[in-house]
Amino acid sequence: MEVNLDLHCDLTAYLLQPYSSPNGDVRCSVDKLFAGNVKMQVMAFYSATEKGSVDEVKEQLKHYRSLLNLPGVYEFYPEKAELQEGLGIIAAVENASGLCEEDQPVEDAFKNLDWLISQAKIMYVGLTHHLENRFGGGNFTQAGLKDDGKRLIDFLD
């Protein structure tokens, strides 16, 4: 049987919806991931560039942590590069606006990222999504990398 590694899943954002369930009627449900023989799943913490984006990522982290309590779900560590039985999950920040809102000091992004890393294994941090933010331009913009984006990249390095 083939093994599938999936690098993007919106389950934690979906779980922000009222009455949602990790095994609900959604194509990214844990049940469907198991049925598709997904052995490693990146759980993208997405928030739009707007007020409340940092709190939204913190809520998604809570859902991520609760997924780890489900039978057969474990946190994946790429440095071990070893898949176990079940579903390995690892978090990612899909839009750095989830680390720091537009009107907050950029140092808040560093503090929030450090805190996230203390709570979950993070696969990657995306600076933008579709639109422009303080870190750079998304795929629907002409803006490039901005000074705060350079600072975040330096911090990640």
Predicted regions and their residues:
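N-terminal hydrophobic targeting/anchoring segments and the immediately downstream early-domain regions
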Residues: M1-D147, R151
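Substrate-binding cleft of carbohydrate-active enzyme catalytic domains
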Residues: L152-D157
